[in-house]
Regions:
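Asp/Glu-rich intrinsically disordered low-complexity tracts
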Residues: 185-203
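Active-site neighborhood of HAD-like aspartate-dependent phosphohydrolases
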Residues: 1-48
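Short, electropositive alpha-helical surface patch
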Residues: 59-73, 99-112
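Conserved Lys-Pro-Asp/Glu-containing loop-to-beta segment of HAD-superfamily phosphomonoesterases
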Residues: 102-132
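Acidic, Mg2+-coordinating phosphoryl-transfer loop and its flanking beta/alpha structural elements
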Residues: 125-169
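Non-catalytic pre-domain segments flanking phosphatase-related domains
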Residues: 1-9, 13, 42, 171, ...
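Substrate-recognition element of Asp-dependent hydrolases with the DxDx(T/V) motif
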Residues: 33, 37-70, 83-96, 135
Length: 203
């Protein structure tokens, strides 16, 4: 069974900017984010990125620039023996009215199709409401981080009609969110061991 985690990029893995991340030099990883992805890999998770990149549609940078940023990310991960299972991006602006710009579910649809699995319960970690909303149609488990736009988003959560978002756990950064996920895994493993012990007692 494939274990997936879906991450937003800007504001979760790397620093964000109101002026967009346009060059490889502007792409700067947030403290702990590379190690957090590596820890997910070591725990058996495939990590996928779903990111809006409207700077392409706005003419602020091109696909070569985007590829250079992602090569930098991949290189940093490789140094820790880690990798991404895929990067799914939307290059469109809001005026394009596309199906893939979050909060529309197109990127999440594409991930489900690519991996051929249900995304029900798959953690989706983001810093904005649109990140978390994008996963609702697939019943992803939303997790908010306070980096990037996250602090402002946290203030908005209580007014959201989607009860799933109101109940989303909030962490300071990706590193802490991964701590939470891995701790949950340990708890599940303990429960499985208890069930096995009960079955042995029945025998």
């Amino acid at each position: 069974m494939t274990k997936l985690v879906i991450l937003d990029r800007d504001g979760v893995i790397n620093q964000d900017s109101d002026n967009y991340i346009k060059t490889v030099d502007e792409w700067i990883p947030l403290p702990g984010s590379i190690d957090a992805i590596a820890r997910l890999n070591r725990a058996g998770y495939s990590v996928v990125v779903a990111t809006n990149q409207s700077g392409i549609g706005r003419g602020l940078f091109d696909l070569d620039d985007l590829e250079a940023m992602h090569e930098k990310l991949s290189g940093l991960l490789a140094q820790q023996g880690a990798e991404l299972a895929g990067i799914f991006y939307c290059p469109h602006t809001p005026d394009d009215h596309c199906h893939c710009r979050k909060p529309a579910p197109g990127l999440i649809d594409a991930i489900a199709s690519e991996f051929g699995v249900s995304l029900n319960g798959v953690p989706l970690i983001g810093d904005s409401l649109r990140d978390l909303q994008a996963g609702l149609s697939h019943q992803c488990t939303p997790i908010l981080v306070r980096t990037g736009k996250g602090t402002a988003t946290e203030k908005k959560l209580s007014s959201q009609p989607e009860i799933e978002l109101q109940q989303a756990p909030v962490f300071d950064d990706l590193d802490q969110a991964v701590d939470y996920l891995l701790a949950q895994d340990k708890d599940k493993d303990k429960d499985k061991d208890k069930d096995k012990d009960k079955d042995k007692d029945k025998d």
